[in-house]
Amino acid sequence: MNPLIIKLGGVLLDSEEALERLFTALVAYRQEHQRPLVIVHGGGCLVDDLMKKLSLPVVKKNGLRVTPADQIDIITGALAGSANKTLLSWAKKHDINAVGLCLGDGGSTTVTQLDEALGFVGKAEAGSPALLNTLLSAGYLPVVSSIGITAQGDLMNVNADQAATALAQTLGADLILLSDVSGILDGKGQRIAEMTAEKAEQLIAQGIITDGMIVKVNAALDAARALGRPVDIASWRHAEQLPALFNGVAIGTRILA
């Protein structure tokens, strides 16, 4: 069975209750299904908190965090350090043998600078599956932060949805983007069950899909097109539904190629 990539985001990393529910669901799923799993994560809330403590400005452009040279080391520490090791500690609590990685390990993705105006913000593309396949075949759970490294050796902050998309392409994996919301919502706050590129363009033009959700939807559409299969956007808040979601049942918004 092809691997499943689960991207974690939102305030999940700040909530012990949410992490407990998530890892309990992961344990249940792994016991019932011999399917390779990969976790990909960002940690925007952790970064925002750290920036506030350090009195550094937080600037976002089109839903992406502007990352100047004097912040990339701090953001790397927050994502590849604190956020990644927090998830590893939860895996250990639940007897899951996990390995902490970033996008640069084993050349799993190829990362280039996205836009000079954004600073040290990268775009990830599919790379070599060798390292991840080796870990998965040995029964490990890779936990991958969204920090990338360019061919020139520069650290890059990559949007975690886009990072997960690139890794899904690397592995030919199914992809689930977990977030704070139950899926993509229409103008009345109701969940949209299915989303096409045409429908997404309409909702963006109408100002219903905005900011970070635009990045998330575009990443999901890119992944659905590249993989030739749907991608799910769903909430981590309903833990009892997560095993069904991991097993292919749509509980959020299903993005169609």
Curated annotation (Swiss-Prot):
**SUPFAM superfamilies this protein is in?**
Carbamate kinase-like
Q: Which InterPro entries match?
A: AceGlu_kinase-like_sf, AcgluKinase_fam, ArgB, Asp/Glu/Uridylate_kinase, NAGK-NC
What Enzyme Commission number(s) does the record list for this chain?
A: 2.7.2.8
For this entry, list what GO says about its biological process: arginine biosynthetic process via ornithine; L-arginine biosynthetic process
- Please give the family membership noted in the entry: Belongs to the acetylglutamate kinase family. ArgB subfamily.
Cite the HAMAP family for this sequence: ArgB
The record's note on quaternary structure and interaction partners says:
Homodimer.
Identification of the protein by name: Acetylglutamate kinase
The protein's organism comes out as Pectobacterium carotovorum subsp. carotovorum (strain PC1)
